Amino acid sequence: QLAEQYPPHPYSFSYDATDETGARISTSESGDESNSKTGSYSYQTPDGVYRTVNYVADATGFHASIDTNEPGTKSEAPADVTINANPIEVKEAYAFKAKSAA
């Protein structure tokens, strides 16, 4: 037996939070009566590295655009995704062992 089908109903939601390290994450999405979805999600680290993904999901498929400054990224457009990269330079971090007390 098939479950009863209901037509799509418009909706929207969002949240924005900052964790104990200072990293920020957020998302939002809305859907309409034609079952199309539009939304975004993002994060930003305390040192300024960020990524934002904006998307549309509809009868033609899932289409995303990504804005980022993550190290090692480059601007390109594979498949149906556009990546707008502006990578930042990362300074290497070094760890030193403490000398033991003699």
From Swiss-Prot:
Pfam families in the record: Chitin_bind_4
Region Disordered: start-end pairs: 1-45
Chitin-binding type R&R domain span: 8-74
InterPro entries: CHIT_BIND_RR_consensus, Chitinase_insertion_sf, Cuticle_Struct_Prot, Insect_cuticle
GO cellular component, as recorded: chitin-based extracellular matrix
Chain positions found as Pyrrolidone carboxylic acid: 1
Record carries keyword Transport: no
Polar residues bias: start-end ranges: 36-45
Keyword entries, A-Z: Chitin-binding, Cuticle, Pyrrolidone carboxylic acid
Any GO MF annotation of the entry: chitin binding
Described function: Component of the cuticle of the tick. Binds chitin.
The protein's name in its UniProt record: Cuticle protein 10.9
Source organism: Ixodes ricinus (Common tick)
